């Protein structure tokens, strides 16, 4: 998409200097400006900034359009087959052992290839804990790729007293086979925490979320 926009921009820019008609030049000028702004915006939204690389785990953050809160993405490789990782991700008995800052968790429903979880997340004083109902959708793309979509459903159950319901959560896990015994794991999320947590305070802390989650998950997978 970005390459296409850049090509259009280059064509318009070239036309701007070769067209002799004044009215046409003005139109091309404004069209060129609009395309440039759209292209710059698209590029900015897709640029992931590396913020941490340690213990074989890479973490990136990105500014999202229309939000003060950044998204995170983490990547790692594990010595394990895709199906073994999926088995761990689906195991409701151990999910609280690898989700970071998990204060409480309950499997609400299993439906076909979907799981619905209620999860309470611990936050440091003076902030109240957050909670959300998450829908995990397990999708086998092909024999070498598996995706888990993670979507928050804030209205699924009534809010609990003393806990702030998150406004929005959305992300996914992507498992890609590298060879018969190695899998690349990508974990990406964007969260709107709700309440009165300023973005300047929240954004630096999101780096630890995927990093700690990956470390704990890898320890379980590679036991």
Task: Give short role names for the model-derived ranges.
Residues 40-44:
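Sec/Tat signal peptide C-region and signal peptidase I cleavage site
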Residues 1-2, 222:
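Generic detector of intrinsically disordered, low-complexity segments in short proteins
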Residues 14-20:
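Short, positively charged and aromatic/hydrophobic N-terminal segments
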Residues 3-4, 21-30:
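Bacterial N-terminal signal peptides that target proteins for export
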Residues 31-39:
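Bacterial N-terminal signal peptides
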